[in-house]
């Protein structure tokens, strides 16, 4: 049974029993007991400071690397709104730095950099999602990760207190950053450098072309399903056990890139999770290697 939630009075927006499937790239998942979109950072800080401490909080980015279970999410689900989407220049004596709200799409940052002749962040065009989500999982592609470009990060803790972390404080590792306690990233400073528009444009086009040729970007998917291992790419292990194209219900292993799971139109979240767990079992049984989910799975498990 879900805990009764007493909600603080805020300037943002609450929705109860809010359907979440349309907020994820898989287009599956149940409802959130409470959905909250804060008006701004002050509103979010007040909310955190005054919410019952026993209430579970889940933070959504763009839903591009997320699987929400069919039974939905207890507690409060938070999605950062437009006030967390700003991009500004920051004066620094040593680096070219831009300040980016955590709710900003990675694609929009890459586009901003092109417009302002800033290089070094082109890889973001190949990573669906938001800046905050990218920091949380140290997302990466095409030879770069967030740890390579993050100068500092601002975050709120569970009590609404603000903290500033330098990149070294975030303990970035492959597909994760390790920090103590609950944090919601609100803003980051990213390092870039001066470059010409043609040079930046060429890099962006190359990344986008590779994505179109190698990934099922026009289907309902959530990006790489599993983390690569020390010695193998995840797709190599999935191919090795013969699961390319395999289906459970409406969920399928992509024929184009078998580390991508796709919703063929009528999949449930359970179909997708069960397919992923079948992959993990088959790979372990045949190779002794345990694949770790890269997709974040949230929500209540079915009984």
UniProtKB/Swiss-Prot annotation:
User: Which pathway, metabolic or otherwise, does it act in?
Assistant: Cell wall biogenesis; peptidoglycan biosynthesis
PROSITE patterns, A to Z: FAD_PCMH
Lineage, top-rank taxon, reads Bacteria
Gene Ontology terms for molecular function: FAD binding; UDP-N-acetylmuramate dehydrogenase activity
Q: What class of enzyme is it?
A: oxidoreductase
Region forming the signal peptide: none
Q: Which residues form the FAD-binding PCMH-type domain?
A: 27-217
Query: What main location does UniProt list?
Result: cytoplasm
The UniProt family comment states: Belongs to the MurB family.
Give the protein's recorded name.
UDP-N-acetylenolpyruvoylglucosamine reductase
Q: Tell me what gene encodes this.
A: murB
């Amino acid at each position: 049974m879900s805990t009764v939630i007493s909600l603080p009075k805020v300037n943002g927006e609450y929705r109860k029993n809010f359907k979440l499937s349309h907020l994820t790239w898989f287009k599956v998942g149940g409802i959130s007991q409470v959905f909250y979109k804060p008006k701004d950072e002050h509103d979010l800080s007040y909310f955190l400071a005054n919410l019952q401490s026993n209430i579970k909080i889940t933070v959504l980015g763009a839903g591009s690397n997320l699987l929400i279970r069919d039974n939905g999410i207890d507690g409060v689900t938070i999605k950062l709104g437009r006030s967390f989407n700003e991009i500004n220049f920051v004066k620094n004596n040593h680096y070219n730095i831009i300040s980016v709200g955590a709710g900003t799409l990675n694609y929009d940052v890459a586009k901003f950099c092109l417009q302002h002749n800033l290089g070094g962040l082109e890889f973001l065009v190949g990573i669906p999602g938001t800046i905050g989500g990218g920091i949380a999982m140290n997302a990466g592609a095409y030879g770069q990760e967030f740890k390579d470009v993050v100068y500092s990060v601002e975050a709120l803790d569970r009590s609404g207190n603000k903290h500033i972390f330098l990149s070294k404080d975030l303990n970035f590792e492959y597909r994760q950053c390790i920090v103590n306690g609950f944090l919601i990233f609100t803003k980051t400073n990213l390092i870039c450098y001066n470059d010409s528009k043609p040079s930046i444009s060429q890099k962006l086009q190359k990344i986008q072309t590779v994505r179109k040729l190698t990934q099922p970007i026009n289907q309902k998917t959530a990006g790489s399903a599993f983390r690569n291992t020390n010695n193998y790419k995840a797709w190599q292990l999935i191919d090795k056990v013969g699961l390319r194209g395999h289906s459970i219900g409406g969920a399928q292993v992509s024929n184009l890139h078998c580390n991508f799971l796709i919703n063929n139109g009528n999949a449930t979240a359970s179909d997708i999770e069960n397919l992923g767990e079948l992959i993990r079992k088959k790979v372990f049984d045949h190779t002794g290697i345990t694949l770790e989910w890269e997709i974040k799975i949230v929500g209540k498990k079915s009984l």
